[in-house]
């Protein structure tokens, strides 16, 4: 993907990882599904964030989250990924870990003609994300190739 502000630069996988991490962080803070954040930002804003990620990652993540929440009118909800059954797990993955999971899934399923923003919208709106984000299951820590295969199959079965 070409940087929209600096056409001679490419957006890197690390830039994608940062934006996926911020999506996860903001979604958790607002108690919203990840796809709410991605869909509310939209394709153009995602392209902007991806193009600025190499600079934004140096800022305080709380300040970046605040700017995105205020700038795009993101609202709190009731979706809380941290509510897990203690019989199944006693911890949840960090926002950085889930940012890595989702950035890998975007890259591994990127289709011809798509940029990272298109891939993010497609992946975060796929039903498989409801399973990945259910931390009572083990889906989120499956190897990348298993997540990719499950994405294309539409389930983990």
Name every feature range the model reports, one short phrase each.
Residues 47, 51, 67-78, 104-111:
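Amphipathic alpha-helical interaction surfaces
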Residues 1-2, 157:
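Intrinsically disordered, low-complexity linkers and terminal tails enriched in Pro/Gly
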Residues 124-157:
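Glycine-rich, aromatic-bearing surface loops/beta-hairpins
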Residues 6-67:
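N-terminal interaction modules that seed assembly of large macromolecular complexes
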Residues 6, 10-13, 88-110, 119-132:
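A structured, charge-rich N-terminal accessory region that forms the first stable segment of a protein
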Residues 31-39, 76-81, 112-117:
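Short, surface-exposed acidic
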Residues 1, 54-90, 94:
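Long, compositionally biased
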């Amino acid at each position: 993907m070409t940087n929209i502000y600096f056409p001679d630069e490419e957006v890197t996988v690390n830039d994608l990882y940062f934006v996926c991490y911020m999506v996860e962080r903001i979604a958790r803070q607002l108690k919203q599904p990840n796809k709410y954040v991605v869909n509310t930002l939209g394709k153009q804003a995602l392209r902007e964030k991806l193009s600025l990620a190499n600079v934004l990652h140096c800022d305080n993540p709380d300040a970046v989250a605040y700017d995105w929440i205020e700038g795009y009118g993101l609202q709190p909800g009731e979706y809380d990924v941290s509510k897990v059954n203690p019989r199944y797990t006693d911890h949840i993955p960090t926002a950085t870990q889930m940012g890595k999971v989702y950035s890998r899934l975007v890259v591994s399923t990127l289709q011809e003609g798509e940029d990272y923003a298109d891939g993010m919208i497609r992946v975060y709106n796929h039903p498989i994300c409801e399973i990945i984000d259910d931390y009572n299951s083990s889906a989120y820590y499956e190897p990348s190739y298993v997540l990719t295969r499950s994405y294309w199959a539409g389930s983990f079965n």
